[in-house]
């Protein structure tokens, strides 16, 4: 093993229910598809302290990098100082995934020096960080995009939920906070990076945010939903023709119980959602029914969520990321779960009770 994929601050969680870890593991799998043999440095028993065990490092900066560090607990109580300390000692070749290597030196070293000069309490391990080597890593790191390391015949595109669409031999583009309405204003075709080849399959998965926050704010939510789907399918058919491909549109996730805690990053207009659970689920089901009206040989609807619904008609918490937020746990992705990256064997499949819903409330 000569390469490692790691995160500089919070270690990649071994727990399959982590949305943040899932994106890192997907990058690892894409690197593997490109012929790179590597290990994902995870928490618990999957953690390798000496990063110099490896020759090459691929740095995952998280799926929510905003450009600024937010250390939970600050310099005094941040619980993962050891991980950054170990990270700082790596002497080999460094690749930065997706974004240019951030200037962690600039964002941290001054704060450490200032705290020391004022005798403010900090974790003493910050003073053991190899800051000169952090500068070297920043200056020498080469930025790469795993999606573009080889030519793939298939592409899946969507908002932050779209990472669940991943499987080997697929490009996977996930754009957090992107609504279907916003995607359509930009044009679905604009999300397919310029390529000199056609795609056999193109998939889109937008709309969950529209249902959660926007459609029920419209004067006529039913009419707004129908119009949104009409434009969605019109543009999807245009993509099918443009790339000589079959386009698949994903049905949306069921609605979870309203007691689910949603981090403020997922709020809009100071609320975690707009409309009751039943109202939003009615819109979700209408969305699916409208999608199916436009099915044809080049436009398909991927129906996949019935097994995630509990006896109350809700998206069951056990299928979701833990301990909070709105995404699925990787364990329940529809195509690929990547058990092997966690050193696990997939469980024997057990039948899941399917609950069918209706549109009675619209009749």
Tell what function each PLM region has.
Residues 58-71, 192-226, 253-262:
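Oxyanion-hole/transition-state-stabilizing segment in secreted/luminal serine hydrolases
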Residues 3-7, 11-33, 105-201:
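Serine-esterase "nucleophile elbow" of acetyl-processing enzymes
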Residues 96-99, 120, 245-253, 282-318, ...:
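Extracellular serine-dependent O-acyl
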Residues 95-105, 205-210, 237-279, 303-310:
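Active-site segments of SGNH/GDSL-like serine hydrolases
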Residues 11-17, 66-73, 176-185, 209-230, ...:
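Surface-exposed cleft-lining segments at the edges of enzyme active sites
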Residues 257-303, 325-335:
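Substrate-gating cap/lid alpha-helix
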Residues 41-116, 137, 145:
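Extended catalytic core of nucleotide-activated donor transferases of GT-like folds
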Residues 128-143, 291, 315-363:
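Histidine-centered active-site loop/cap adjacent to the catalytic His
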């Amino acid at each position: 093993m000569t390469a490692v994929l790691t995160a500089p601050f919070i270690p990649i969680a071994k727990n399959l229910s982590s949305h943040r870890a899932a994106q890192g593991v997907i990058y690892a799998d894409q690197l593997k598809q490109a012929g790179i043999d590597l290990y994902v440095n995870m928490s618990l028993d999957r953690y390798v302290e000496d990063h110099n065990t490896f020759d090459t490092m691929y740095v995952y900066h998280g799926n929510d990098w905003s450009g600024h560090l937010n250390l939970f607990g600050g310099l005094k109580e941040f619980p993962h100082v050891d991980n950054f300390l170990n990270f700082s000692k790596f002497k080999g070749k460094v690749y930065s995934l997706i974004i240019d290597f951030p200037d962690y030196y600039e964002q941290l070293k001054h704060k450490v020096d200032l705290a020391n000069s004022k005798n403010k309490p900090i974790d003493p391990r910050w003073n053991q960080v190899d800051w000169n080597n952090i500068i070297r890593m920043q200056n020498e790191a080469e930025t790469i995009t795993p999606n573009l390391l080889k030519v793939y015949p298939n592409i899946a595109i969507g908002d932050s939920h779209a990472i669940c669409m991943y499987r080997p031999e697929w490009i996977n583009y996930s754009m957090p906070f992107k609504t279907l309405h916003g995607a359509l204003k930009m044009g679905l075709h604009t999300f397919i990076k310029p390529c000199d080849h056609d795609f056999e399959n193109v998939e889109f998965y937008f709309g969950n945010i529209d249902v959660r926050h926007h459609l029920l704010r419209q004067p006529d939510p039913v009419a707004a939903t129908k119009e949104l789907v009409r434009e969605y399918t019109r543009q999807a058919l245009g993509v099918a023709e443009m790339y000589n491909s079959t386009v698949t549109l994903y049905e949306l996730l069921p609605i979870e119980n309203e007691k689910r805690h949603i981090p403020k990053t997922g709020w809009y207009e100071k609320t975690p959602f707009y409309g009751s659970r039943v109202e939003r689920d009615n819109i979700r089901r209408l969305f699916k029914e409208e999608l199916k009206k436009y099915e044809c040989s080049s436009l398909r609807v991927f129906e996949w969520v019935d097994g995630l619904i509990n006896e109350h008609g809700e998206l069951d918490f056990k299928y979701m990321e833990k301990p909070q937020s709105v995404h699925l746990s990787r364990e329940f992705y529809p195509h690929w779960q990547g058990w092997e990256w966690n050193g696990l064997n997939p469980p024997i499949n057990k039948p899941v009770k399917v609950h069918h819903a209706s549109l009675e409330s619209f009749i």
